[in-house]
Structures are given as structure tokens and as C-alpha cells.
Amino acid sequence: MQPRDLSHHVAYEAGRGIEEVARELGLDPDDLVKLSSNENPFGPSPKAAEAIREHADRVNSYPKAAATDLRGEIGDLLSVDAAQVWLGNGGDGALDYLARAMLDPDDGVLVPDPGFAYYGMSARYHHGQVNSYPIEKDDDFEQSPDAILESYDGERIVYLTSPHNPTGSEVSLSDVEAVAEGTDEETLVVVDEAYGEFADSPSAVALVEERDDVAVLRTFSKAYGLAGVRLGYAVVPGEWADAYARVNTPFAASEIACRAGLAALEDDAHVEKTVETARWAREYIRSTLECRTYESAGNFVLCAVGDGGEVAEAAQKEGVIVRDTTSFGLPSCIRITCGTREETKRAVEVVNDLL
């Protein structure tokens, strides 16, 4: 017996972890700086950590009340109805729910290239077809409606990323609307705002209330520092929000995750410190690194270093883990996550010595 044909599927390549690198190189994990996965350098919100401890003895219960409360709090924060908030096991889970709601077998999706691999992975899991639109280095990775619509061929879902991973470029609200206007009535435009807290531009949630063909993806993994508990959500138009009950995995957002999310939403100071430090680090990297860098609205900077794999491997041996972006189709670049001031300065010093 064998599984079905998975030849068109790909494995997700995540940034390397501290423990993995430490074992490989025989180093003390405490001596390593990990700036490869766009994680929060300050850890989770202290309020979220306390909530996890406080509710640890309640994980024998399914998270019905906690999930309901969290959907309500997110709805209040974004000025949408709680029913429009689709909680998932990370942003990936919310992407899966959107695919389940939208895709029949062989329906197409349009994804950015380079871009987040899970858009295509999720579509293929749901028997969809994956097409791409180019984001060109020569255009500073601009995500222009013209280029997107030129590649569009009636796909059921079009994915936009703002800020874009791994380049940091943004899509304006007017450009999101232009894409939505230029696609068919039955095409959903999904705006992935996983890094939205780090950007100055307004959220596309404003368009969700105006249209029935735009949805927004958000996560607690980045600015809130909760990557390990896996919590994200989609905000969908009210006209079809009730589809959630028919496509979600029951209780996929765990009791601990929901309680941590509720507490994190109350910790403005933690988010503000995280965002302020990321903005400082972006500017420091761009002004101090001795190679071309690209303007970023996320908590990371894409850097053209010549041979990304070689530089990333050498930096690792010096105790700094950065992301080789070869898996994104950018072998000449690395991506540096915005760390604390000390971590960021160390990373820039190490990379400069390698250039």
C-alpha cells in the first residue's frame, strides 16, 4: 500500500533552529543568535505566558468558550463581527480553511513567486492547481496590480502578501482593490498580513467590510511572540462567514492557544516594544550592512550578499543563524530577522566580515 501521488507536493523548509545548529556545530545554544525565522526576539507577551501557566490545568477541556471569547475580542479590535473571524492552528490553518471553503478539485490559485510556500502547499492538499505571478528583483520586488492581473487566468484564489515574505514589500489598499476589481466575481483575494503589525500602512480589513471578495490573514506568531502555540485567523466577508462551521477542524485552536491570544491582545506594551525595536533594526541593517538591502515593512530585511548559502553557512559557524533564501528562489540573498539591538548589531558585524 502506498499514499496517493504526492510528486507535485513539496516539503516546507523552515529556518533552522538553535538546538539543531548547536548540535551540528558542537556549540552552546546560549552562544547562538537565531535570526532566521522572523520570531519575536523578546519572546511571548508576559501576560500570555502567565495565562498559559494559569490555564495549564484546564487543558482537559475543549476550548469552546475560549475560542468564542477570542473571536469576539478580535472582532472588537478590528470592528468586524465575531463570526467573520476564523480561528486556525496558526495562519497556516486559516489558509487551509479558506482553501476548503473556496476550492473544488482542479480549481486554480495564483501565488507570488517568490513567496510563502504554504499558499501552494495548501492548495495542492485540497486538490487545487497552482499558478504564479512574478515579483521581480529588478523592480525592487514591487507587487503591482498590472503584473498580477497579467498572470491571472480565472483562478479561484489570488494571494497577496503585505508585508511580503521574504522581500518586505507592501501592497497598498488601492492596489488590493485594483486586483479585486480586475478579477472575476467568484475569485477571492486573500491578503496575508502576518507581518502587518510592523507596517505603517492600513490593514486590508477595511476592504473586507466593503466587498465580498477580499479576506485577510493574520497571526499571533510574529508581533505577539506566540509562534510555538500556533494561533492565527482569517477575517472574511460577513456574507459567507457562516461557512466556518462547515470547513474548520474542530477545536484546532487549542485552549492554551486561545487563552494566550486573549492575554496577548491586552499587552500593548509588549507589541509596541517589539514593533519599535524591529523598526530600529530594519534601519540599522539597511544603513550599516555593506551590501544591497531592500526596503522592508516587516520584521526582517532581505540582503543581496552574492552567495546566500555560503554566507549563511559561514555566519552560522560564527554563531549567527540567518536565512539562506535559496528555497525562495533567491540564492544570492539572505534574510535577517530583526533581533534585539545587541543581536542585530552582532549579526551585521558578522555578515559584514564575510562580505
Curated annotation (Swiss-Prot):
Keywords: Amino-acid biosynthesis, Aminotransferase, Histidine biosynthesis, Pyridoxal phosphate, Transferase. Its EC number is 2.6.1.9. It comes from the Archaea. Coiled coil: none annotated. CDD domains: AAT_like (cd00609). InterPro entries: Aminotrans_II_pyridoxalP_BS (IPR001917), Aminotransferase_I/II_large (IPR004839), HisP_aminotrans (IPR005861), HistidinolP_aminotransfase (IPR050106), PyrdxlP-dep_Trfase (IPR015424), PyrdxlP-dep_Trfase_major (IPR015421), PyrdxlP-dep_Trfase_small (IPR015422). It catalyses: L-histidinol phosphate + 2-oxoglutarate = 3-(imidazol-4-yl)-2-oxopropyl phosphate + L-glutamate. GO terms for molecular function: histidinol-phosphate transaminase activity; pyridoxal phosphate binding. Its cofactor is pyridoxal 5'-phosphate. One of its GO terms (biological process) is L-histidine biosynthetic process. Pathway: Amino-acid biosynthesis; L-histidine biosynthesis; L-histidine from 5-phospho-alpha-D-ribose 1-diphosphate: step 7/9. SUPFAM superfamilies: PLP-dependent transferases (SSF53383). The modification N6-(pyridoxal phosphate)lysine is found at K222. Belongs to the class-II pyridoxal-phosphate-dependent aminotransferase family. Histidinol-phosphate aminotransferase subfamily. This is Histidinol-phosphate aminotransferase. It comes from Natronomonas pharaonis (strain ATCC 35678 / DSM 2160 / CIP 103997 / JCM 8858 / NBRC 14720 / NCIMB 2260 / Gabara) (Halobacterium pharaonis). The lineage of its organism: Archaea, Methanobacteriati, Methanobacteriota, Stenosarchaea group, Halobacteria.
